C-alpha cells in the first residue's frame, strides 16, 4: 500500500516539487521518492522525529539519499544551465505551481491516511538544507564561457554606479582616450587634400584644397602665385610617365583625374603663341622663355649649332646682363644648361656672342630669344607617337597652325586647320577628313594607328583644344547630355586666343615684379653702380605695355637702340648719292652704327623716368613714326655701291643671302647673273672739296646674283603691302658682321615674311666664298625649313695695287 500510494503521489505532482526556490535541477534527481505532500510536511515530521526511532526502512532511505547526494555532486556541473534557460524554467514552475494548488486539498486528505508511510519517509528530506546550499556553491565551479555573459552584464550595470562613486579617479583617464579617438577620426576624415605643383623655374608650390575641388581651383591659385594675368597660354600637366603627360581638365574633380595617386602637377605652356611679341607683359614672355629652354635641353626642340649658340647668348644676357670680365670670369657660360649635348665649343661661341651685346635689357633679350625660337620647325609642337596604315613608325604633331606628320625627325606632311574638315577617333585609330582641293571633287580621309584607345582620345582632345584656341573667336557651348546621344561632349572650356588678346589689351597695372632664376644682376648695374640695378629701373615704369598702341610695344622692344639714330644718318647721306667716286667702306659704316647712338638711347631711358605719362606716350609715338618711315624705306637704294646693288636687284624676295646658292638644294629655280665693274674711287672724306692730290685706288667689283623665277600672280612693285612688324638682328666678330632684317607685310589678305641676311667679311687673305655661301644656306634652311631661297647675291670688292 505504501509503495503504491507513494508512486501515485510521485506521478501526480513531480513538477511542483522540482521547481521551487531555484533548486530545480538538483531536486529533480534527489526527490523522486518524496511524496508530493507539500513543503511543510517534511518539516513538521522532522520536528516530531526522535533520534531513537530507527527502523530498517529508515536506514534504507538514508542509504538511498546518500547515493543520490553523491550523484548530485558528480553531475552538478552538467545539470546547471545558462540563465536564459533557468528563467524560462521558472515561468513553467509558476504555471505548474497554480495547478499544484488544486491538488493540495487532495494531498492533505491522503496525508492523514498515509501518516505512517510519510513518517517512515520523512528522514529523506532531512538533508534539504544542504541541497539548498549546493547550487550556490556549484555556481562558482561553472566554466568561464558560461559565466562570462552574466559577468559582463554585471559590469555594465555597475559601471554607471562606479563612475558616480569614483568620478575624480576615472574622468582624467577616460577623457584623453576619447580625445585621441576623436582626433584620430578627424585626421581620417579630413576634407582637404595636399597638392604640389612644380613651376617652370623648378620651384615647388604647395597648397591645400577641398576634397571635391576642381582643376580650375588649383590653376587659379598657381596663376595668382606667379602673378600671371595672361594665364590662358598655360596649363597644369599630370605626368603618367616620364614622356607622357595629360592636361588637367579645369571642369572635373581633381580626385577623379589623379585616380587615387598623389596630387602632383607641373606648370607648363599649353598653347605656344605664334607671335610672342603680341604678349602684353614681360613676365609672360619670361615664363615662355623658361619653357622653351626646357624644351631645348630635353631635346623636344631640336636646333642647329648656330641657332643654339644664338639662343644661348640671349639666355645668358637675360640672366646675367652685360659681360664684365672682373665679375664673370672665363667659364661662366658652363653654369647654364643650354643643350643636352653641351660642348666646350658651344660655350665659347655663346660667350663670344654674349660679349658683343651692350645695353640690352633682360626684356629685350627675352624677346630676341622668342623671335628666333619661334622660327624653329618644332616650336610649340605637341608630339604623339603613331603608325601609318603600312605600320611605319611616325609622329603626329599638333600646333597652332594645324597637324604635321614627322618621319625620322623630318616633316613629311602638313594639314593646316583650314584644310581639315573633321577629326575623329575610333578605338585606337585616328582619322582626319581633308577638304577637297580645286581639282578634287571628293573629300579624302587619312587614318593613323595609335598605341591604344586612350592615346587616340588624348590626341583628339589636343586637336580640339588647339583648333578652338587658335582658330575660333569664341568657345562653343558644351552640348547637353541626351538620352542615347552619340559622340563626345568634350569641348575646350577656356578663352580663345582672340579673347585673350582682347583682355590683355585692357590690362592696366604696373609692371609686375619677378626674380629671374639664377640671376646675377642684383649686385651691380650696367654703369657699374653698386646699389641701382637694371631690374629695379625696369620696375619703375608707371604703367605696363598694354597702355600703348597694340603694335607699338613689339616694335619698341624688338628694335635695338642703334636703330633710333639710323634715320638721321640716312637722311644726311642721301645728298651724296650723286657722287659715284666717293663711298664709304662697310667697315666705316659699322663703326658709325656702333659709336653714335648708344649714349643717346641711354639718355632717353634716364629722362623717361622723370616725364609724365602723356609725355612718354608722345615721345614713343614720335619714335614709332621714325621707325615706321625707316622700315618702309628699306627697299630704297643705299648710298654705297654695295647696298644699292643689293636693294635694286631684289624687289621680291622671301629669304636672301650675301652668298651663292648651293647646287642641288630644294627650292625654286635660280637664274645666275654676273657683273664685273672696275671703278676708280678716292679716299677723301665725304663733304669736303679736294684741294690737293689724293692717291687713286683701283677697285674691282664683282657681283654674282642668283634669283628665283618670280610668280605671275605676285607683283610687289604694284602692291607694296601693309607693314606689320620689322626688326633687325646684328652680330659682330673680329672679321665679319651679320645683319638679319625681318619684315612682315600683308598683301591681299596674305601675310608675307621677308628675311634678308647680310654677311660682310673683311680681310686681307683669300676667302672661299663658295664655302661661306654653303654654310650660310645650310644654317638658313635649318632655321627656316618652311621658307625658300629666292635670291642670293655675292658682292666682292678687291683693291688693285
Swiss-Prot record:
- In residue numbers, the region (Disordered) covers 1-187, 516-613
- List GO terms (cellular component aspect): cell cortex; cytoskeleton; nucleus; plasma membrane
| Sequence intervals crossing the membrane | none
* The FERM domain, residue ranges: 193-474
Q: Give the matching InterPro entries.
A: Band_4.1_C, Band_41_domain, EPB4.1_FERM_F1, Ez/rad/moesin-like, FA, FERM/acyl-CoA-bd_prot_sf, FERM_2, FERM_central
Q: Where is the composition biased (Acidic residues)?
A: 108-117, 154-166
Picking any one GO biological process from the record gives: positive regulation of protein localization to cell cortex
Residues in a coiled coil are none
Start-end of Polar residues biased regions: 141-151, 591-601
- Bias category Basic and acidic residues: which stretches? 88-107, 167-182, 563-577, 604-613
An example Gene Ontology molecular-function term: calmodulin binding
Q: Where are the annotated segments for C-terminal (CTD)?
A: 653-801
Which segments carry the region annotation Spectrin--actin-binding?
588-651
Q: Which CDD domains match?
A: FERM_B-lobe, FERM_C_4_1_family, FERM_F1_EPB41
| PTM text | Phosphorylated at multiple sites by different protein kinases and each phosphorylation event selectively modulates the protein's functions.
PANTHER family given for it? 4.1 G PROTEIN, PROTEIN 4.1
Known partners and oligomeric status: Binds with a high affinity to glycophorin and with lower affinity to band III protein. Associates with the nuclear mitotic apparatus. Binds calmodulin.
What is this protein's name? Answer: Protein 4.1
* Source organism of this protein record: Xenopus laevis
